[in-house]
A protein has these predicted regions:
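Short beta-strands and strand-loop turn motifs
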Residues: 2-6, 55-60, 180
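Phosphate-binding site of ATP-dependent enzymes
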Residues: 70-151, 172-179
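Short hydrophobic/aromatic-enriched beta-strand-loop microsegments
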Residues: 1-5, 30, 111-112
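Active-site nucleotide/adenylate-binding loops and adjacent lid/helix of ATP-dependent enzymes
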Residues: 11-98, 150
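Conserved metal-phosphate-binding beta-hairpin within the catalytic cores
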Residues: 93, 102, 157-189
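Short gly/pro/ser/thr-enriched loop/turn and capping motifs at secondary-structure boundaries
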Residues: 8-13, 119-120
Length: 190
């Protein structure tokens, strides 16, 4: 028996590419993305993603291998770094809005937490070592936006087949829309 999600849901949740494809397939919002490899057309991908991107291993956690790229050369370097951790590497447009994490316990969606990192982005250092990362609960969202985020988080969680408990991470894109990042089936309950 499991205290949370089973093996299949946990494996799916660990694969960011698979989750994004599942969410897109049912119309849930997740940022555009490109799968990168050594043959990638770096300038074309950078342009398609808006000129700035986050590059990450598709199957890694804790922001390991995550890099910001603002030029095609930086994207290629970021891909090489991320490829050290996973065979599949993805790039998404850089989203500079707020980051939220939403815990789910049984059928209850807990209040969202807004994360403010002093670093350029919420990386491994900011998550586990920085005394300057701040967590806000209540998150400051209006009741309507909080309800929207809670609904979205539960939909993302259930789409991946998760159960019991977990956490959904979301960012606000440059147009003010929520975009799903990932589901954590065994998270630290920040």
């Amino acid at each position: 028996p499991y205290t949370g999600s089973g093996v299949l849901a946990s494996a799916l949740a660990m694969d960011k590419l698979c989750c994004k494809q599942m969410w897109q397939g049912i119309g849930l919002p997740t940022a555009d993305f490109a799968v990168l490899d050594e043959q990638s057309n770096w300038p074309q991908i950078m342009q398609r993603l808006g000129g700035k991107a986050m590059v990450k291993p598709a199957c890694e956690g804790y922001s390991i291998g995550l890099s910001r790229a603002e030029t095609p050369e930086q994207m290629q370097q970021a891909w090489a770094e991320a490829a050290r951790f996973a065979a599949t590497v993805i790039a998404e447009p850089l989203m500079e809005g707020d980051e939220y994490t939403v815990a789910i316990l049984g059928d209850q969606v807990l209040p969202s937490i807004r994360i403010e990192a002093s670093e350029v982005f919420y990386d491994y250092q900011a998550k586990y070592f920085s005394d300057e990362t701040q967590y806000f609960c209540p998150s400051g969202l209006t009741a309507e936006r909080e309800s929207e985020l809670r609904e979205l988080s539960m939909s993302a969680f259930k789409t991946v087949g998760c159960s019991g408990w977990g956490r959904v991470d979301v960012m606000v894109d440059n147009q003010g829309l929520f975009q799903l990042l990932e589901v954590n089936t065994v998270p630290g309950m920040t």
